[in-house]
Design a protein with these regions (language model features):
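A short core secondary-structure module
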Residues: 1-27
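A generic local secondary-structure boundary/capping motif
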Residues: 4-8, 32-37
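Glycine-rich beta->alpha junctions and the first turn(s) of the following alpha-helix
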Residues: 34-130
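Generic structural signal for well-ordered, non-transmembrane alpha-helical segments
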Residues: 88, 124-131, 159, 163-170, ...
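Charged/polar positions within long, soluble alpha-helices
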Residues: 95, 99-102, 131, 135-138, ...
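Flexible, glycine/charged-enriched surface loops at secondary-structure junctions
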Residues: 106-110, 150-151, 188
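C-terminal helix-coil-helix/basic helical segment that borders enzyme active sites and/or dimer interfaces
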Residues: 131-164, 174-185
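Glycine-rich phosphate/cofactor-binding loops in nucleotide/flavin-utilizing enzymes
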Residues: 182-227
């Protein structure tokens, strides 16, 4: 699935269509060398004169946010599934931390860290952060399946769910690493990988800037231009 900009008599339009990997002009650069999310292999895609046949055009719409079924379908499923992915990362971080402190012993207290009140508080805090993520994702997913009309608030609320999940996961993994101590800093520790993966949530759509701009437009309307 690709999209491009077309200049038409009615003004600029966004065109969404399907191409095949075998199509002439399509190429992928093997450049996915990132801090985290390495398994996704999200390489740079090059489109050099690629032609999309008319039968593979999904929709043509005005640029920007749109209620077009194709645009909404792509965006809604992407944001919900991305939010659920980060929820899974955060919940796994809590599990790993709980397993770790159950075997890590405290020299000071002569027992495992799972009996240390401060460590117990930290892991409980991580779990509480993640506990608030799931309901928002599930409600949005149910409303998508049921065809609920949320009007103009749909796009901002979908972005908010992804953002909430990503930010919560980052805070959760940090708490888990603090609870586990320096060993979690090693690349061989699962929490190290989870932390690197959680950082990707800062950059994936919708980021903080576009999220806040969308909510400001929803609540306050567009910015008024000075006369």
């Amino acid at each position: 699935l690709i999209f491009g900009r077309a200049e038409t008599e009615e003004g600029p339009k966004s065109v969404f269509g399907i191409i095949h990997r075998s199509d002439e002009g399509y190429a992928i650069k093997d450049d996915w060398d990132t801090l985290g999310m390495r398994a996704t292999q999200s390489m740079t895609t090059f489109l050099r004169g690629v032609t999309v046949p008319e039968e593979r055009i999904l929709t043509v719409t005005d640029p920007g946010p749109s209620a077009d079924p194709v645009i909404f379908g792509i965006f809604s499923h992407f944001e919900i599934l991305l939010a659920a992915t980060y929820q899974g990362v955060g919940e796994r971080a809590v599990e790993v931390a709980a397993e770790h402190v159950a075997t890590r012993r405290s020299v000071k207290n002569q027992t495992t860290y799972s009996n240390d009140p401060d460590i117990r508080w930290r892991i409980a805090e991580a779990a509480l952060i993640m506990n608030a993520v799931g309901p928002q994702i599930r409600e949005l997913a149910r409303d998508i399946d049921a065809g609920v009309d949320r009007g103009r608030s749909w796009m901002p609320q979908l972005s908010a769910a992804k953002n909430a999940a990503a930010e919560a996961t980052l805070r959760t993994v940090e708490q888990a690493m603090r609870a586990c101590g320096g060993s979690a800093y090693y690349n061989t520790h699962e929490l190290s990988r989870l932390y690197r993966d959680a950082l990707a949530g800062l950059f994936q759509p919708s980021d903080q800037e576009s999220l806040h701009a969308a909510w400001a437009n929803l609540i306050l309307g567009p910015i008024e231009k000075a006369q």
